[in-house]
Swiss-Prot record:
Catalyzes the retro-aldol cleavage of 4-hydroxy-2-oxopentanoate to pyruvate and acetaldehyde. Is involved in the meta-cleavage pathway for the degradation of aromatic compounds such as phenols, cresols and catechols. The active site is at H21. It catalyses: (S)-4-hydroxy-2-oxopentanoate = acetaldehyde + pyruvate. Its EC number is 4.1.3.39. GO terms for molecular function: 2-isopropylmalate synthase activity; 4-hydroxy-2-oxovalerate aldolase activity; manganese ion binding. This is 4-hydroxy-2-oxovalerate aldolase. The gene is dmpG. It comes from the Bacteria.
Amino acid sequence: MTFNPSKKLYISDVTLRDGSHAIRHQYTLDDVRAIARALDKAKVDSIEVAHGDGLQGSSFNYGFGRHTDLEYIEAVAGEISHAQIATLLLPGIGSVHDLKNAYQAGARVVRVATHCTEADVSKQHIEYARNLGMDTVGFLMMSHMIPAEKLAEQGKLMESYGATCIYMADSGGAMSMNDIRDRMRAFKAVLKPETQVGMHAHHNLSLGVANSIVAVEEGCDRVDASLAGMGAGAGNAPLEVFIAVAERLGWNHGTDLYTLMDAADDIVRPLQDRPVRVDRETLGLGYAGVYSSFLRHAEIAAAKYNLKTLDILVELGHRRMVGGQEDMIVDVALDLLAAHKENRA
């Protein structure tokens, strides 16, 4: 495949969805309006809006949001004129009923997300989204956990259901550039030429931007990123950094770098109650290949049981826990506590 640097990249911002994890889903409506205005001014292509765990993610298991998904979507819809509103749906958390409501509130793009081995559970939701006329994306989470060829098979399933774009989501921020190359090439080998591919990076190994750049060089059409990297774990690929690199490379991204830089520092970074950065705990996520949104839950469990967050995260990695198993974090903490007591006996 010949890389075409003049091809228009689709810039997908996830500050108002993945970024919600970084502040335990506590954005105010004024926050989302201000962020949406800045992103729309900068001319990103889509703005993803939802609880961090997607439509109807607000729950005891994942953490309650300050507002409902529909309140957030409606708030953003009133502020934008260029970008499309995207949303995320995990089958089993959100339903087709929730998707219909999100569409009526203004969402026009949906990413139907499953664990990387469970594409088959997305069929109903992808078909329903296509029937609504939505831009319908298949989103394979924790993509580091299976070989490239197996991941491509799962993407092919989502394509067969009607998805017109397939995303590789490095939810654990655990992949290297070669991992990205292998998976992008595997996608391209089996998907239809007209099916787009996307990259969703996390920055736990400080490779979020590098991995996104490599993905584009391998033919990726859509790139996820967030202002100031606002997202689970060490965050996503920082949008303003990715755009700065793309600008230096002469790529056609269509966004305004300085507007993004101002929004990152003046609007988003002040909202962080815990710095979104690579540190001992978030590096542990990437090193152990752990779902990035486990971070804040593990920190709470560590404080409650007087354990180290890193120990909990590494054990979660050993057990190959995946998104949706947040309830197991306390179980792991209790097992570690019992082991510590036994060692002291």
